[in-house]
Amino acid sequence: MMAFSRLKRSEVAGWLREGVRRAALWMALAGLVSVRLAAWEADELERGEALARQHCAACHVFPEPGLLDRRTWEQHALRKMAPYMGVARLRTEGRPDGERLEESGVYPPGPVVTREEWQAIGRYYSARAPARAVGLEAPRPPAAPTVQFVARPLTIPGAVPRSTLASLSAQGGEAWLADAGTGAVHRFGADGRLLGAWGLGGAAVHAWRGEGLWAVTLIGSVFPSDVLAGRVVRLRTDGATDAWVEGLGRPVMSLPCDLNGDGRTDLVVNGFGNQLGRLSWHEGLPGGGWRAHEILGRPGAACTETRDVDGDGDVDLLVLMAQAQEQLVLLENDGHGDFSARILLQFHPVFGAVHFESVDMDGDGDLDVVMSNGDNGEYPSPFKAYHGVRVFRNDGGMRLAEAWFHPVHGAFKALARDFDGDGDLDVAAISFFPDYRRAPEESFLLLRNEGAWRFGRETIPGATLGRWLTMDAGDVDGDGDLDVLLGSFCEGPPAVEIPPGLATAWRTNGVNGLLLVNQRRR
């Protein structure tokens, strides 16, 4: 203290000035480093985005980071994509479809990007994705209970609900439920009484009604697989079956029609597959048998309609494709079974397209498109604000623009019908991945058309009696109005949180399906 007290004021001031100078210098250096670091990070993210746009958009629509939350990108989506970039290997040893996958070349033999480039892509998505789950918007008011329908449970004795087909249109006066566990089509009367069953030896997922027979599609493997175990059978009214086409990759639909104008029956087959798949048509040959023709050589053919869209007298195809390259495609037939493709709608790879149908929603005389997108089952994933039911309005030249959207988490199928008989089309919708904790009634919704693109929300008291995978509409009791049939599949990917008590009830309550009897005529 004595030594310090003898210092001249000028010396003390000098020390202080030097300290301030050095502090300012260090702060300037730190600021410069911070600026340069921020610039480097910005450059790295820009580089990661450029790499993502180059490589991800080479296979499908570029997925913007905001489509998923950060955790889902890091723990699921990027890991799922790594084998397609050759930076990780998908283990195929011991898989029934392993050899087929290895031979297909669906995964590159070596890296498409370097390890460092892949990490740059990952850093870009991690930095730009939102931290919170996407789609957790404020809950909508609960749907009101409807008086339109009375629910009749349908029970397959001893069968845990694994319904893969619900049909009211296959056989007049009957409700059909196909069950993956029993491998049969179970037939119910309009009163809910079980009439009998036809054993098919597999899970039926689609039935097309013809004159005295049905073309029934058996998927082969309900869960994702590329084993060629699917088939189409001809089912007669006495329950006898004939094999039509076998060795298919998870077919989900088959439509008999004449595609080449030779007067013989051909088959359009939606080979949904998994990593592999194709949309094909099978030419009926003069002496019997079929010749296969590939139309689209990729997986994801989810739903097809046969229509003469261009008015030239032959059968064209409208096809909804899922599995990354999500599109609605018009395939125009030249009259001989050769097709030219026109993409009507295109979506990002996590859009989750599941089903569509073409109907005249606005009454202007041309066909609009009603679409449901809510497939949320590939991995645990947050609810998505862009999942729901949409109407795309046709301008008369098959140019489609979205006219209406109703958010529904996990929307799986939507049917536009005049359920209340007022002359316009309402929408019945099911969800396989709803928010069971906050909005369980969205398992089934009746969206009642109120005009001017406004729809009221209604549900049924038994909406959570099953996990609805499949649905159909038709007049099962012959009273002139449209009833609805729901099929419950209580298993499936654990992509959304399901309360344990609800999952147990699905397995044990004996509700394999629900017949919703329309009360309009009563």
PLM features: what roles do these ranges have?
Residues 22-34:
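Bacterial N-terminal signal peptides
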Residues 40-47, 55-522:
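Beta-propeller-forming repeat regions
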Residues 52:
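Short metal-coordination and nucleic-acid-contact micro-motifs, chiefly zinc-binding Cys/His arrays
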Residues 7-24:
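Bacterial N-terminal signal peptides that target proteins for export
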Residues 36-38:
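Sec/Tat signal peptide C-region and signal peptidase I cleavage site
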